[in-house]
Amino acid sequence: MSFSVASRVSYFGTTIFAEMTQLAIQHNAINLSQGFPDFDGPSDVKAAAIAAVEAGQNQYAPPNGQPDLRRAIAVHAQRFYGQAVNSDTEITVTSGATEALFAAVTGLINPGHEVVIFEPFYDSYVPDVIMAGGVPRFVPLRPVKHALRERSVEGAQPVLSDSEGSKDAIDWVFDPDELAAAFNNRTRAIIVNTPHNPTGKVYSQAELETIAGLCQRWNVIAISDEVYEHIVFSGVQHVRLAQLPGMAERTVTISSQGKTFSFTGWKIGWAIAPPDLTLGVRRTHQFITFASSTPMQAAAAYALALDDEYYSTLAADYQHKRDFLAAVLRDAGLHVSIPDGTYFIMAGIAPLGFDDDVAFCRYLTTEIGVAAIPPSAFYSDEHKSLGQAYARFAFCKKQETLERAAERLMRLKKQ
């Protein structure tokens, strides 16, 4: 006898991250697919976690989060964005940003509500909406060539060359009219991810103002996923959506310590929202995980207070890794889209004779020994073709790991 899964999850399969990681393990490939560092974050942050354990902070934390961490999150919001946040009523600590996303969607979306989602999207967005009974409305980010901006790419010309030899760079942009058409009286929320996984796009102030205007016109909640907030390059500024006029009262801002401090396994995230929206997050959170790891919360509070040098060095180190991998991918024959943020690079595979990202990533893993992610997994069926011409590579790795990957990627030139 066998049993079927619940209908609400029958739509879902194994995540592409799990699939590609398993394939990488089977073929002893270097894993540039999943976005986790192969190095630890700051040693003093680890020491803070150990000290918390040894001090006996090993029982349940308050469901909404340890007061010290909530205060640290509030101070961080003021320090970097000038955002005044009440740590008692407007901050909820969760087991990673993914739980914060689920809690926000589940706690604020009713069956039949529509949720606008940009694609490509982080792969939990759509399942979250569907499990809440919501209806996703997709708006694609399309790759558009534009005049070259100044970029620093070590060891390579900072340009993208198409088959005709023209020199252009790529932006991933939405059509404002297409976005406006996605809003209606059934629209309850929009999910915005900036800096954006997988494209590396950092939404401009003007783009965020367009989004904000539609949210206010249609009385829509914004769920802003900002986990890569401190990983931006070349003087590009990350603008928090809640900073814009009229948006603080309708925005759930989500972030975590995993990306900023390189401890993805600790799973400490948070949601900042006005009290009425926080209520929905907290009512859901209490019945998912109830509370998050107590000693890891103590360490996260310590980490958030690190000096400005830590944050600037983080971005500079990742920019160096970005530049190295971009040069390697270009030299290997791929068409590179230089990211302004995150630790991912989207690379066009057409110059290598591929038009199917899944086939390419499987070939790359099994034959070349480097794993990447096929980004078509981050699109709806309607727009899946937009992702099939690319592969996503993660550069959140030790330099020696990237150099070993580079040696293998050079085999592509010989194919």
Language model region names:
Residues S2-V5, S10-H27, F36-A52, N64, ...:
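PLP-dependent class I/II
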Residues L32, A55-Q59, A72-R79:
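Glycine-rich loop-to-alpha-helix module at the N-terminal edge of alpha/beta enzyme cores
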Residues L69-I73, G96:
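Conserved AMP-binding/adenylate-forming core of the ANL superfamily
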